[in-house]
Amino acid sequence: EMRGGTIAAVGEGETWRSRTSSATVIAARDVAGPGAILTPGFVDIHGHGGGGFSYESDESDIRAARALHLARGTTRAVLSLVSGSLEHLTAQAARIAAMTHTDAGILGTHLEGPFLDPGHRGAHDPAALREATPDAVAALLAAGAGTIRQITVAPELPGAPKTIRTFVDAGVAVAVGHTDADA
């Protein structure tokens, strides 16, 4: 039990509410789970779903994918979206932004595109790639409502330098990727 940021009680089973002193807590060294490894939960900053469920889909699929990852130790995640239409990306960014208010394990959105070099698109649909315009950037930032955490951009594209500056000024980490840049 925690009170005012301090451990106030320890125990197991029905005794967990037993009052104790801080000296008892400090002296407690035994941990159940011999042979197990205790670590903080994992944080995934680039994942597209799991268990057949996609972060590109509806809330129930997003929650199902998150449940799969949570059961395996990933306690928090930035949900990645691949390049899609501006309408799809803004709708998903808004959906994920709303979910951050009810699920502390959802940290926000990583936009992997749509401002990528077509020659280095990987699995991205070439029809979904676009130039970075101020209107598109503003729409994505507005939809994300402060929860877009990262975006992948090809810096050589027209409008990319201004786009990068706008995202950085909004507190979004910008990753260089799917690019023809070579140094």
Describe the function of each predicted region.
Residues 36-88:
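Metal-associated gating/positioning segment near the N- to mid-region
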Residues 5, 35, 46, 69, ...:
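Divalent metal-coordination and catalytic microenvironments
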Residues 1, 38, 44, 110, ...:
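Conserved beta-strand segments that form the floor/walls of ligand-binding pockets within enzyme
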Residues 23-24, 28, 36, 75, ...:
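A structural micro-motif
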Residues 1-39:
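Histidine-rich, glycine-flanked metal-binding segment
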Residues 6-8, 62, 182-183:
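Short, intrinsically disordered, charge-balanced linker/junction segments flanking boundaries
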Residues 59, 85-183:
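Histidine/acidic-residue-rich, glycine-tolerant segments that coordinate divalent metal ions
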